[in-house]
Amino acid sequence: MSLRRLSPSHLILGTLVLGVIIFNLYVLTSTHEDIKKVKGPTYHTSDNTKIQSHISNYDSEEYVDRLTAEIEDAKKEELISEIRKKLEIQEKPGVIQKLKTELRMKYIDDIKNHLKQEITEQYSNEIFKQYAFSFEIYSKKVDEYALQLENSLKPASCLAILQQAEKDTDSIPDLENYLTKANDKYFKRQEYWRYLLKDILLNNKPKCEPLTKEEKGEKLNPTYQWDARIISEQYLLGSKLTIPGEKFRALRSAHDQVVKQLKSLPDPPSQFISGHGIVVNGGGNMIGSALTAIANMRERGSQLPVELILDTKQEYDKQICEELLPKKLNGKCVIVEEQVGKEVFDIINEKFSRKIMGLLVSSFDHIIAMDADNLAIKNVDNLLFTEPYLSTKMILWPDLWVKLTSPLYYKIARIEPGEIVDRFGIPNDASFAEYITKDKQSEVHYHDLDNLPSTISVETGQMVFSKREHLKSLLLALYYNINGKDFYIDLLYQGAYGEGDRETIVPALHVMNERYSLTNHKVHILGYDAPNGKYSETTLGQTDPRDGFEFYQDWRKFLTSRKLDTRLNPFQSGGYTSDLMKQFHDYKRQIYQDKQYEDEAAVHRMITYKLPSILFLHCNHPKIDPLKNSKEADAEFGVYSRRNMGLPDKVEKLLEGKDWELRFHTISQWVACEAISKSSLYWEKIAGKSQQQVCESVGKYIEFLKKDTFDNEATKLTILNQLGEKSQPKQPEINNNNNNNNNDDDNGKNKQGAAS
């Protein structure tokens, strides 16, 4: 490129660049220390000797020490703060826990006493509130008011019967009779129950002959509820139970009529039914067992009032019903015969029907009902104030067996089976998707169908229910029992073990469309090895529904976490379910944290998950009855010759270290030798054996049980010993003519140890 082609601007720019280069070379190579200031930064220049001197200073030990000291001073506070935080995180939880432990040990007695006072006050307030809610005092006043003003209140009944009177009568004089009957029905207990039992239940008996032996067919083979087995509609009809057309129509017509009348009933009068309490059936010479059950509940801490149900006036004992129960055990006697009238009582004479009548005529609304041979091992009172009772107002417990109810019953009751919704008939590892494709008549478990009750059978040794809420179902269940021998026992059981009321409750609840809780829980079987080598079942252990409610919530959460069907049966037999339960225990073996305060780190502990614990021990054969048991005390293989619930090494873990067999018999000794010691009438009329003989027999058996007991506290009574002075048992005179009045065998005996 020639210079002529460069523009003046290019020449000027080149000159400036050349000048800057020359200037920089001059400055950087200068041998004098100068400071050159130009527009922009300030440049410091020096010769090489001074630069080397500064470098030497930086390398010196003195400089390094000085610099280190400066850094330490600057960072000292920061380092101390960091160390303090680390130590606090590492050591504080342990220090706090140590202080907690020291304080707990130092003040534990004071804390316990303070808590005891608070709990006592709180519980007293709760009991007061419960009675306030039950309107017990109010109901008594209403009852008194109604009786006092009976004549004045007759017009109130007029409106209820005018329409009926208009249809049934043509003359005015009959109206007074109608008013009198209506008034009696609403204001006299006996007339009220007579109306329900006679006018509705007895008057609607099927108008046909009972089923013949041929029509009843054959008995089916019972199945344990933990075994997965298809019991199909085809199998159930295979019993060959048949009902000819005319007889079937009569059964259905009577059933329709009684259901219609029951559904139209108003709520029961509050002066007849109110409050919370416990009802124990002691009829049929079961007073010894019943008093043991009641005394045991008091020893467990129960404070609810108790009603002891007796069948007849002949079972009434003045000392028991007027002194022992009201003055020491907060209870009273209720005689069924007096409540319903002799006419109705004599007609309804089957024992399980009378058991239901006893529940009906008791005065409580919210009831914990127990057989005389059923003993609680915990306080039962708050069953009425917790789930699942609050949601359903009816708690039922499972028996050992599955239902074998005939499909013909559901046709009589007009209950139509729906689609497959449950899976009791198949193993837990089977596919439900495949199950629902099976033939419903021959390949599907019948009670897995919608609209039908669960396949789980019911054990009615204990029930918890609201009578006001479930009166209609209880009356229908009584109707089934009244007509059981002729029709319904064969329709509902078809060979299933057990008898009586247990399989009549749930069908009645379904017909009336009333809510209830019946959950599949493990039923524990206790017994002994008989001399012939066979295992003899004596006792059923029923679990606490308060635990079961939470257990099933946990179980379903576990199944959901594994993406499994939440209907799987946790108590089904088989290896798959056993492995699944082990996984469930691992799933629940989690860390629980103490409550944290401020910045306190959590202290952890490991908790092993526990399945629902036992609440009731239903000792159905032999019963804990000091009178009956003492009659065979000298027999070689009698009740008092062995442990009936099992050897200590087999039951200690299940019963959580408490020897309940020894505890129960200790209480039965208190009943026989102290509680009814003043009742010469009882010993003469009912016992058939002297009190001294009974006490000696029970005492010897207690000493026998103490030899291998694992429970040193078993014979110590706390609450019962505070109820009054102990009296020495006296041998009353025995009327030999009455010695055989109570020599019948156990009426509550069941096949294979199934409870009634």
Swiss-Prot record:
Keyword annotations from UniProtKB, A to Z: Golgi apparatus, Membrane, Signal-anchor, Transferase, Transmembrane, Transmembrane helix
GO cellular component: Golgi apparatus; Golgi membrane; membrane
Any one Gene Ontology BP term: protein mannosylation
Primary location: Golgi
Matching InterPro entries: Alpha_mannosyltransferase, Nucleotide-diphossugar_trans
EC number: 2.4.1.-
Topological domain spans for side Extracellular: 32-756
Gene Ontology MF, one: alpha-1,2-mannosyltransferase activity
Subcellular location as annotated: Golgi apparatus membrane
Positions in the Cytoplasmic compartment: 1-10
Listed Polar residues bias regions: 723-734
Transmembrane regions: 11-31
Membrane topology reported for the UniProt record: Single-pass type II membrane protein
Enzyme class: transferase
Disruption phenotype: Leads to sensitivity to calcofluor white and SDS, as well as to thermosensitivity.
Region (Disordered): 723-756
Annotated metabolic or biological route of this protein: Protein modification; protein glycosylation
Pfam families: Mannosyl_trans3
Primary role: Alpha-1,2-mannosyltransferase required for cell wall integrity. Responsible for addition of the first alpha-1,2-linked mannose to form the branches on the mannan backbone of oligosaccharides. Addition of alpha-1,2-mannose is required for stabilization of the alpha-1,6-mannose backbone and hence regulates mannan fibril length; and is important for both immune recognition and virulence.
Family: Belongs to the MNN1/MNT family.
Protein name listed in UniProt: Alpha-1,2-mannosyltransferase MNN26
Lineage: Eukaryota, Fungi, Dikarya, Ascomycota, Saccharomycotina
Designated gene of the protein: MNN26
